[in-house]
Amino acid sequence: MDRIKDFLLLVVLVASLFACSIDEAQPLAHKKLVIASDFLYPKDAKFFAELSEKEKVAIEIIHMRADSIQYRLKKDGFNTNIDLVFVQSLLGIKTLENQAFQPVQNGFSDGELSELKRIRNNWFLVGKDPFVISYLKDSLDKPSTYRELSSDYLWTSPDLASVDVFKAHVRYQFQKKQGNNQKELKDWLRGLKDHRIAYQEGTDSTASTQLLLLKYSAYSKNKLLAQMKKRKVIFPKQLYCDYFAMAVVPQAKNYAMTKSFLLFWNENANSSKFLQHFGMNALDRIKKGKGFYISPEEILALLSKRN
């Protein structure tokens, strides 16, 4: 009889300890950071495994276009489960320009996020995406500047939407740097349009052989292009760039984790090994007035004025 009592007591004790362990684990199991992105996919959460393990948080990525993010946030209001928005272009910021985002405060200082660039409407620029020129090494068409695409060579792009950012750089240079020479600007843009031809995707095993103008991320993520040994990539001396950016959703349910994510990115902002997962380059340290530099905020302003 005593043995039965001892056994039952042991069972109760084990069950009690097991229940306690479940209760203690519950808060961790429910810690989650939800990121809405127009370029990340659910599988990309693996690149944040270090943060996930350190903070004991599950990172969920919802892939949707910037305009869909805008619609979702407007529809959900403060009931949204999205904590952070992560876009691949200034065009994404433009699309979301009427959406309010949360100022990041509460103990954060500029020093803590020193590798990120704060811009208007509480966005953080976290990486740049240069416009590159790519052609076959044995091609007779070998431009070294963007300007030549407007006058000497036929070109195309697999991502025509991003060319709007490129053209905003051209407009900025002429309006701000070259005395607002409208005639030359129109000639530049007209020539760029006239020299553009239709993009040919290629086949499942053969990449396009055309002269391309595209963002570096688009090139690096296109396996056929990136693995084509005969193709060369040029970074023009006066480099135009688009930018990746993130912003915190107002009253984010997991606000503390969004701050941890920003800190994590800041720690890896200059790691080429980390950034290459996303086709990014580290942000420029060049300041206005020192070397060739066009402020992303100036480009964003020009994009906004186009509508």
Residue ranges: model-predicted function:
Residues K253-A256, L263-N307:
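Extracellular/periplasmic juxtamembrane helices and adjacent flexible linkers that interface
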Residues D38, N81-I82, Q88-A207:
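Extracytoplasmic ligand-binding site segments that recognize negatively charged/polar headgroups
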Residues L113-L116, D129, K186-L192, A226-P250:
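Periplasmic-binding protein-like
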Residues L90-L96, S205-R231:
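A ligand-binding cleft/hinge motif common to bilobed small-molecule-binding domains
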Residues L8-S16:
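Bacterial N-terminal signal peptides
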Residues C20-K94:
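Early extracytoplasmic/lumenal segment of secretory-pathway proteins
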Residues V132-D138, D242-M257, F264, K273-H277:
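A bilobed periplasmic-binding-protein/Venus flytrap-type ligand-binding module shared by bacterial periplasmic
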Residues M1-L8:
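Bacterial N-terminal signal peptides that target proteins for export
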